[in-house]
Amino acid sequence: CKWDGIINLDLLWKQYKRILKGNGAIVLTASQPFTTKLISSNYEMFKYEWIWDKLKPTGMLNASHQPLRRHENILVFGIGKTIYNPQKIQNPKGVEKRSLYKYQRENEGGETVGEIKQGGVSKNYEADKLLPITIQQFSKDNKPQHPTQKPLELMKYLINTYTNENDMV
């Protein structure tokens, strides 16, 4: 396909750095082997990855040569500490008692990391909520307008996670 070509990653990063503001994040989707190329092209800005579980596997034509693919990588890049607003979900078990502890330490750059506890409880602790995990499940859209189209709900999730209200996307 004409649209599915190798992009110039040096030019891509030059433009991303030009438009990235403050503690903004660059969030990209990829599949192997491009995932590895993308991370390697800017390891300094790479933060971590999520896994998007599509719930339905693809790749039936290659099923006799390799496993079906049911996930894509979501790669997060940024300069310094990026905005992160965890999208908590309702705990199906309801309110649970959890052991909490205080911790704080300095990272290699001398920044204080860890949660500042107030009265022994994390200031963002909600007993009936669960913090996100790196594997997120979103069904693919039934009638996509593009072969690589991502689900609207996945994009909303990422926008809510990596931006504050009224931020530019």
Which residues make up each language-model segment?
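Conserved Class I SAM-dependent methyltransferase catalytic core
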Residues: 2-59, 72, 76-77
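Class I S-adenosyl-L-methionine
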Residues: 40-169
